[in-house]
Swiss-Prot record:
Its main location: cytoplasm. Gene3D superfamilies: ABC transporter ATPase like domain (1.20.1580.10), P-loop containing nucleotide triphosphate hydrolases (3.40.50.300). This is UvrABC system protein A. It is found in: Cytoplasm. It comes from Proteus mirabilis. The keyword DNA damage applies. InterPro entries: P-loop_NTPase. The lineage of its organism: Bacteria, Pseudomonadati, Pseudomonadota, Gammaproteobacteria, Enterobacterales. Belongs to the ABC transporter superfamily. UvrA family. The gene is uvrA.
Length: 118
């Protein structure tokens, strides 16, 4: 399976969108403020991946974890179970981005500092 297919996503700002995302690649979601970038990344894709991961655990292990709400979507295919590196509450800084809030920006800087060529 080389793609993630989403059909009928209606979480928060998303209005019944359909999309195909390539797997095993670094994907950037861009758009205007309020266009549903975080709704797609966190509330749809991550929530469904994390929900599938928790469902794969034993009943004993699940009692210690909170299950995320199932996203309002018709169909998601090709999505792997997901866990987050670190989860923080959002800041109220208007200059914050998904990259700075999730600290993925820091991880990417470390990665490219090691493997990048000047």
């Amino acid at each position: 399976m080389d793609k993630i297919e989403v059909r009928g996503a209606r979480t928060h700002n998303l209005k019944n969108i359909n999309l195909v995302i390539p797997r095993d690649k670094l994907i950037v979601i861009t758009g205007l403020s309020g266009s549903g970038k975080s709704s797609l990344a966190f509330d749809t894709l991550y929530a469904e991946g994390q929900r599938r991961y928790v469902e794969s655990l034993s009943a004993y292990a699940r009692q210690f974890l909170s299950l995320m709400e199932k996203p309002d979507v018709d169909h998601i295919e090709g999505l792997s179970p997901a866990i987050s590196i670190e989860q923080k509450s959002t800041s109220h800084n208007p200059r914050s981005t998904v990259g700075t809030i999730t600290e993925i920006h820091d991880y990417l800087r470390l990665l490219f500092a090691r493997v990048g060529e000047p």
